């Protein structure tokens, strides 16, 4: 069964003689079919035999998906770990915090289209976190630019390899859960992505691992992440309630204004049960630099989204302590914005 009609189209699933397929539509010499496992794709007409019509029963009962639900509020922090040596910073990191019960180190990354991963997981890290009363939900990302999300997620074999590697690494290191942080998923990959979440949820459930999935603030352009289905399959759905304005923004603004955060929570609650929703807040802000565009820059922006903005904007991310220090050093006055519910300040270049 292939992604599209044609012998050169990638294979989605191998089927064998005797397998039952549901025909959805005819496309020239190919038929659009659905396999028993729910994969939709195309197969040559000549490969199909004994076609017959069946009346499908509508008496369907939604299965009861069991999962893991903690009897306490999740207070989670992501811990950016970029090397095995950086795992040793867990003691200092936790010493500066209080109230946490979950930590999510950035340990796993998908490295190729076959579903292999890199890992900097540490059992010593896990043991120390457990001693401090914290669960460890290891994060996996898809940030490697050499990985094609369609190639990775549209094939059963690569999904299974990725799922098995994640669960095996979790079990080997005593990890309590997996946090999926797949970003910038193309629209046409959405169905394959949610299939990955479905399959991973089964493995996690069998092995008593918590599954959490990171999501953008809901917008029309990211509905293909299938939040409602995530709300069924995952134990927790995490809103990345920040990046309202980000490094590539055309105008300066808040990282997470009140209404933006409120919208993210309310829209997510339309699809996901409240006891599964976690909202992530930023512990950083941005220092913005605005300069009037030159004639050359305005010409370059013609016909693009940037055309309607008169200022050229750059920024750098600052942790909250560094941001406060910069404000103090500049002798700037901090103002409270009643609409955004954030503090801000601004300086002219000659001040």
What are these regions (language model features)?
Residues 35-69:
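Boundary regions of SH3-family modules and the immediately adjacent low-complexity/disordered segments
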Residues 55-160, 165:
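Glycan-recognition patch characteristic of GH18 chitinases/ENGases
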Residues 163-192, 241-243:
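Active-site groove signature of glycoside hydrolases
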């Amino acid at each position: 069964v292939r992604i599209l009609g044609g012998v050169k189209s990638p294979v989605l699933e191998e089927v064998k003689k005797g397998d039952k397929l549901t025909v959805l539509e005819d496309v020239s010499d190919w038929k659009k079919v659905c396999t028993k496992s729910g994969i939709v794709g195309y197969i040559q007409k000549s490969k199909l035999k004994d076609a017959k019509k069946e009346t499908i029963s509508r008496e369907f009962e939604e299965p009861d998906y069991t999962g893991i639900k903690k009897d306490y509020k999740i207070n989670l922090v992501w811990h950016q770990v970029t090397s095995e040596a950086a795992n040793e910073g867990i003691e200092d990191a936790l010493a500066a915090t209080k109230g946490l019960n979950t930590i999510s180190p950035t340990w796993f990354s998908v490295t190729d289209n076959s579903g292999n991963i890199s890992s900097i997981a540490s059992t010593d890290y896990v043991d120390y976190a457990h001693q401090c009363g914290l669960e460890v939900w290891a994060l996996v990302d898809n940030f490697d630019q050499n990985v094609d999300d369609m190639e990775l997620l549209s094939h059963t074999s690569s999904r299974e390899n990725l799922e098995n590697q994640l669960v095996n690494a979790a079990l080997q290191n005593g990890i309590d859960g997996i946090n999926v942080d797949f970003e910038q998923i193309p629209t046409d990959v959405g169905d394959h992505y949610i299939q990955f979440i479905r399959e991973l949820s089964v493995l996690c459930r069998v092995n008593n691992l918590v599954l959490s999935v990171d999501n953008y603030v809901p917008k029309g352009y990211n509905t293909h992440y299938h939040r409602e289905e995530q709300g069924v399959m995952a134990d927790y759905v995490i809103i990345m309630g920040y990046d309202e304005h980000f490094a590539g923004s055309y105008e300066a603004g808040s990282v997470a204004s009140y209404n933006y955060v409120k919208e993210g929570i309310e829209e997510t609650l339309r699809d996901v049960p409240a006891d599964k929703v976690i909202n992530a807040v930023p512990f950083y802000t941005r220092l913005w630099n605005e300069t009037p565009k030159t004639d050359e820059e305005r010409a370059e922006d013609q016909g693009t989204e940037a055309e309607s903005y008169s200022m050229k904007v750059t920024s750098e991310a600052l942790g909250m302590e560094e941001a406060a220090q910069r404000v103090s050093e500049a002798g700037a006055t901090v103002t409270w914005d009643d609409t955004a519910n954030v503090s801000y300040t601004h300086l002219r270049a000659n001040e």
